[in-house]
A protein has these predicted regions:
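Rossmann-like NAD(P)(H) cofactor-binding subdomain of soluble oxidoreductases
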Residues: 74-126
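NAD(P)+-binding Rossmann beta1-loop-alpha1 motif at the extreme N-terminus of oxidoreductases
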Residues: 1-52, 56
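Short beta->alpha hinge that forms the Motif I/post-I loop of the SAM-binding pocket
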Residues: 31, 66, 91
Length: 281
């Protein structure tokens, strides 16, 4: 299969590296010529250019690894060059704000979005080889127009990339769940780090708990600002629910309520253990 990857950042670079090693013919485009040159020099891609039109007519699949707001702009500019049965997909972390419009803009090509649940704190193609997909989730978000054949092609893409669990779900359920499992987690990490009044002194006392909780606080501010705003209704609901649970813990502390604290801790332990069982299976 011939693929064009639009955007050679961390994820785009990781896709290029893995797919080329799986026998795909991989082309890439990026506004940064240095990223293209790096990918060519390290055999991540067969060829690359700063102009998507150099490859777009000749590939079977176009993978958009660009910011949410840039996706529709790209489609408006290049969809007239798409061909029938060509698959257009994206790796974006939110879906419902643009996928339906993207589906219409992409015709006569076939648009089907997906979301690789993986990444690193660092950004850029230079770090993409370190991006691990093994054991991670790969979410496909078909619409009513998406055929079974298209979903299966994306399933194979996820398998070839090395993902462990591949799930199909609608765009609205995706955004609801991602608002909790990904965006709320990032919001908590950011808030925890920013609540520190004396960060220079804190480093003397950091252990595994703080490191584990705050790893994702090193965040791409431009990308994540877009992701949060595109999914703000879901995220605000999750933040409110989290605050309610944190308040319950706070009030138990204020009232010396050991019984409630123990109940909260037991509940979280049981839920987390059940999650681990499902992950192992």
């Amino acid at each position: 299969m011939k693929v064009l990857i639009v955007g050679l950042g961390l994820i785009g670079g990781a896709y290029a590296y893995r797919l080329k090693n799986k026998g795909y013919k991989v082309y890439a485009t990026d506004i940064n010529l240095e990223s293209i040159q790096f990918a060519k020099e390290h055999s991540y891609i067969d060829d690359g250019s700063c102009e998507a039109l150099d490859f777009i007519r000749d590939v079977d699949m176009v993978i958009l690894s660009i910011y949410p707001q840039a996706i529709l702009e790209f489609l408006k500019k290049y969809s007239k060059y798409f061909k029938e049965n060509q698959i257009i997909t994206d790796v974006c972390g939110v879906k419902s704000s643009f996928v339906l419009e993207a589906t219409e803009l992409s015709k006569p090509a076939i648009y089907c979005s997906h979301h690789p649940m993986a990444g690193r704190e660092k950004s850029g193609v230079k770090y993409s080889k370190e991006c691990k997909f093994e054991g991670a989730n790969f979410l496909i978000t078909p619409t009513r127009e998406t055929s079974y054949k298209t979903v299966e092609i994306l399933r194979k893409l996820g398998t070839d990339l090395g993902f462990k669990r591949i799930t199909a779900m609608d765009i609205y359920e995706h955004d609801k769940m991602i608002g909790f499992t990904s965006q709320l987690a990032h919001a908590i990490a950011v808030s925890l780090v920013n609540s520190d009044n004396n960060p220079n002194n804190t480093k003397k006392y950091i252990g595994d708990s703080y490191r584990d909780l705050t790893r994702i606080a090193m965040i791409n501010d431009t990308l994540w600002s877009e992701l949060f705003l595109e999914n703000k209704e879901n995220l605000v609901k999750h933040i409110n629910c989290f605050q309610k649970n944190l308040d319950e813990l706070k009030y138990a502390l204020m009232n010396d309520d050991k019984e409630t604290l123990e109940s909260l801790f037991k509940s979280s332990t049981i839920i987390r253990k059940e999650m681990e069982k499902k992950w192992r299976n």
